[in-house]
C-alpha cells in the first residue's frame, strides 16, 4: 500500500484531466489507494485486476470506489472486452475482490487439509486438478504460476481484514510458503517454487529439499472417482484413506 501511495504522489501531477487512472492489484482496497487524491481524480480512478498470465487468462475484474464515475467504468469495460478480449466482472471493493477471495481461500483450505493428512504437494495436485473438474495445474502448480510472493500478499490481506470470516483461523501465510519465499523460490518466475524442473525431471519441494515427484492418486480413490457423481461423494466421505 505504501509503495503505491508513494508512486501515486509522483505521477498524479502529470495525469491529464481526461485520463483514466487505474491500478492493478490482487486485493488491496481501491478506496484506500485513492486516499490523498483530488475529488476530480477519484472520479477517474478504479482497480483493473488482470490474472497471471494475462495473455491467456480470460478473466478481468473491474473494481470501482464509491466515487468512480460510471462512464469511466463503461469505457474501460468496452475497451477490455472489445479490444483485449477479456471477460469482465465488476467487483465490489472488498478484500481480494471476487476471484482471489474464493481462489486463495480454496488454496488455504487445501493447505490445511494437506497438513492434517500429511499429504505431499504433488500428491495433492494429483487429487485437486482435473479429477475435481479444475485446471490441471491444481493447487500448488497454480500457486507457482501466480507467484508465491503475490499469493502471500493476498493471504496477508485476508488475515488483516477478514477477522469475522468463519474460516479466519486458516487465513495466514503457511510456513512452507514463507520458507520458499525466504529461499527466493517464488514459483514459475524464478524457475522454482513448490516445483522445480531439473533437466527433464520434475522435482517437488518436500518442506526441506527438492525430490523426485512421484505423487499419484491411490487406486482405491481412483476407483471411487470413476463412479457416477451421485455416488462419488458419499463413497469418498465413507472412505478412510487420507486422499478421500
Please tell me what each predicted stretch does.
Residues 1-244:
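N-terminal glycine-rich phosphate-binding loop for ADP-containing cofactors
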Amino acid at each position: 500500500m505504501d509503495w503505491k501511495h508513494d508512486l501515486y504522489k509522483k505521477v498524479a501531477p502529470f495525469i491529464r484531466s481526461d485520463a483514466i487512472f487505474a491500478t492493478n492489484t490482487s486485493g488491496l482496497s481501491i478506496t484506500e489507494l485513492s486516499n490523498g487524491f483530488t475529488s476530480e481524480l477519484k472520479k477517474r480512478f478504479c482497480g483493473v485486476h488482470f490474472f497471471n498470465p494475462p495473455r491467456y487468462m480470460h478473466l478481468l475484474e473491474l473494481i470501482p470506489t464509491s466515487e468512480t464515475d460510471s462512464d469511466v467504468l463503461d469505457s474501460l469495460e468496452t475497451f477490455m472486452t472489445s479490444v483485449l478480449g477479456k471477460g469482465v466482472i465488476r467487483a465490489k471493493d472488498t478484500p481480494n475482490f471476487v476471484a482471489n477471495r474464493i481462489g486463495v481461500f480454496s488454496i488455504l483450505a487445501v493447505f490445511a487439509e494437506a497438513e492434517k493428512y500429511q499429504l505431499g504437494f504433488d500428491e495433492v495436485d494429483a487429487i485437486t486438478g482435473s479429477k475435481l473438474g479444475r485446471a490441471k495445474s491444481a493447487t500448488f502448480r497454480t500457486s507457482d504460476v501466480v507467484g508465491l510472493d503475490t499469493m502471500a500478499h493476498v493471504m496477508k490481506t485476508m488475515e488483516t481484514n477478514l477477522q469475522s470470516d468463519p474460516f479466519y483461523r486458516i487465513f495466514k501465510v503457511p510456513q512452507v510458503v514463507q520458507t520458499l519465499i525466504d529461499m527466493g523460490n517464488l514459483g514459475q518466475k524464478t524457475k522454482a517454487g513448490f516445483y522445480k524442473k531439473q533437466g527433464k525431471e520434475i522435482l517437488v519441494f518436500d518442506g526441506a529439499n527438492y525430490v523426485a515427484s512421484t505423487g499419484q492418486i491411490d487406486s482405491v480413490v481412483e476407483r471411487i472417482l470413476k463412479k457416477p457423481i451421485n455416488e462419488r461423494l458419499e463413497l469418498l466421505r465413507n472412505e478412510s484413506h487420507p486422499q478421500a
